[in-house]
Amino acid sequence: VVAFPTETFYGLAALATDYQAIDKLYQLKKRPAQKSLSILIADPAELDDWIETIPNQALHLTARFWPGPLTLVFDAATHLPTNLTADTGKIGVRISSHPVAQALVREVGAPITATSANRSKSPSCRSAGEVISQLGSDLEAILDAGLTPGGKVSTIADVTTRLPKILRIGAIAAQEVFSCWEQDA
């Protein structure tokens, strides 16, 4: 498990196809097993490999907001580890706009987890030092790119229904998501 910077806070990366690495991440964060994890991909063209279907309106959202702080929740491909999806059958996906996060995903050549680099219910970390103070030597590495901007977390929208369901308000306003979705409704 590796800590890395994003356009908001530091995140934790584990290979999204590695059941044991995902388990280690859950233990490290002390995250409840019933809370699923999101993934970062390098390119929207990779979506087909990790999800079941892409609603046309979701393509408008990816074109407008990716890379950036919008996580879209899709029906997960059946080959994904069940501990990644918390057995929900759904997976959150996004593309980070941070160059280090993008380089990490490209270098790994597969999706990585996208969860905040902190213990569950603890404040999000903006620096490598904050990550060390919360997670210490339990990490394999920290990709230190200095202070992240912080601010609002990513917005999470479930696009498996007729209209998107906003699961978490963050850097992108709900109205922006709905307006973009309705372009092709």
Q: What positions do the PLM features span?
A:
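Active-site-adjacent structural elements in enzyme catalytic cores
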Residues: V1-A185
